[in-house]
Amino acid sequence: MERGYRKVRIGTVVSNKMQKTIVVAVEDRVRHPLYGKTIKRTKKFKVHDENNVCNVGDIVKIMETRPLSKEKRWRLVEIVKRAE
């Protein structure tokens, strides 16, 4: 039996102060339903970082997973680009 589809997002690390956890901000652009203006929306996810390899400013790929704690439902897949 095959696993269900898992969501994948790319975002920027905004905090790495916790142990084995990072906070990733994912930016999304949506059109306003009535006025048609494009709006930037940012959502923050708590992400499991097993080896504490991420730093603030890194661009990372994250994937949805089973609940790991009260707020963690995402895990780190790869670091797309390191911060300068």
From Swiss-Prot:
InterPro entries: NA-bd_OB-fold, Ribosomal_uS17, Ribosomal_uS17_bact/chlr, Ribosomal_uS17_CS. GO terms for cellular component: cytosolic small ribosomal subunit. Keywords: Ribonucleoprotein, Ribosomal protein, RNA-binding, rRNA-binding. The keyword Ribosomal protein applies. Pfam families: Ribosomal_S17. GO terms for biological process: translation. One of its GO terms (molecular function) is structural constituent of ribosome. CDD domains: Ribosomal_uS17. One of the primary rRNA binding proteins, it binds specifically to the 5'-end of 16S ribosomal RNA. PANTHER family: 40S RIBOSOMAL PROTEIN S11 FAMILY MEMBER (PTHR10744), SMALL RIBOSOMAL SUBUNIT PROTEIN US17M (PTHR10744:SF1). Part of the 30S ribosomal subunit. Belongs to the universal ribosomal protein uS17 family. This is Small ribosomal subunit protein uS17. The gene is rpsQ.
